Amino acid sequence: MTLPAFKAYDIRGRVPDELNEDLARRIGVALAAQLDQGPVVLGHDVRLASPALQEALSAGLRASGREVIDIGLCGTEEVYFQTDHLKAAGGVMVTASHNPMDYNGMKLVREQARPISSDTGLFAIRDTVAADTAAAGEPTAAEHSRTDKTAYLEHLLSYVDRSTLKPLKLVVNAGNGGAGLIVDLLAPHLPFEFVRVFHEPDGNFPNGIPNPLLQENRDATAKAVKEHGADFGIAWDGDFDRCFFFDHTGRFIEGYYLVGLLAQAILAKQPGGKVVHDPRLTWNTVEMVEDAGGIPVLCKSGHAFIKEKMRSENAVYGGEMSAHHYFREFAYADSGMIPWLLIAELVSQSGRSLADLVEARMQKFPCSGEINFKVDDAKAAVARVMAHYGDQSPELDYTDGISADFGQWRFNLRSSNTEPLLRLNVETRGDAALLETRTQEISNLLRG
């Protein structure tokens, strides 16, 4: 049995060919054997196939004697939070996040919301399912419904001093995913006026797949910000583990610049803490962390690596330019809700707009944003780039792909973990012309 839905960090595949209820039940049985004793938290996103997949997964777990705590329709971070908060043995979120319509998937964690990825149990689960030893009888253990979100909401609100918040006008675009439900529950506790875009959860995704990185999806948020004169805008993906920001002019803010901003917000509350960041773009983050009295810690990108490094370093915050933001008190997990609350607090307390907060940073360290290249021979393409710049003796780092520092500019080039792509990021020290030149130069070399 080939199981293409099992990836390095999660399970993702087409329904029903690569992921279906029979497979979900078998995954439940195999997962039960991987976890310590205790209940398992299950939740699902708005996709039409998700409730049935969760029910099948639950049946497999309960047939193996596992009590299941069903938290229902939710975001991925709610499964992480409840797994830790309820001291469960593990948790599974049934979601395909921003993947195409016909996809679904699962994100799995063990106790304390620790990720289950390829080398920490996911491939062992795959092998058990593939060996066809994961058949199960009738469910014997109980399933309990727990849809009370009070503890989660209180935790989110604990990150900000509500007495300092101003009556901001915020555009919120849930993309017909699950984020709108949480915004509505938070709204009575906050002084903000919300302009709701694509707000209702709808697994048919009438306004397109909730992926704010797609230009057509950005346009709706940007347009609403400008039309309503909002202070800033926020858009989420389907399971709202990532959030994206737009300033009051409707301009999309590159995720890189949010990492330094959020680091400073957290360090103001927890002085001297460590901040974990990825190697793709670094100069702005390092400077902002150090200016705030924190200690920057470099780590390979990817949630499993960031969370592990944060735990070993006792870091207060971790940020990736891909809009994943991790918080120590949130079980070291990523949240798409905590960041916008912190940014709203920062805007309120500083009296400055989001545009103003990031503009100087964007001028000081302009970046290319991540550019993807489909290449037939990745090694040969990278070799061309390194041969071209080798005589300039850059400072090299191999934490994640290749990072090359030339003093006034740097680049990171890495292979995608999930697709046949090379990903390029370039930044300079305040030189937009140099950025354009070097980005074009490397792009030409990669294309051969």
Swiss-Prot record:
Binding locations of Mg(2+) = S97, D237, D239, D241
Q: Which UniProt keywords apply?
A: Exopolysaccharide synthesis, Isomerase, Lipopolysaccharide biosynthesis, Magnesium, Metal-binding, Phosphoprotein
GO terms assigned for molecular function: magnesium ion binding; phosphoglucomutase activity; phosphomannomutase activity
The annotated pathway is: Nucleotide-sugar biosynthesis; GDP-alpha-D-mannose biosynthesis; alpha-D-mannose 1-phosphate from D-fructose 6-phosphate: step 2/2
Q: What class of enzyme is it?
A: isomerase
Record-given protein name: Phosphohexose mutases
Catalytic reaction equation(s):
alpha-D-glucose 1-phosphate = alpha-D-glucose 6-phosphate; alpha-D-mannose 1-phosphate = D-mannose 6-phosphate
What is annotated as the active site? S97
Lineage of the species this protein comes from: Bacteria, Pseudomonadati, Pseudomonadota, Gammaproteobacteria, Lysobacterales
Q: Which Pfam families match?
A: PGM_PMM_I, PGM_PMM_II, PGM_PMM_III, PGM_PMM_IV
In the UniProt record, the gene name given for this protein reads xanA
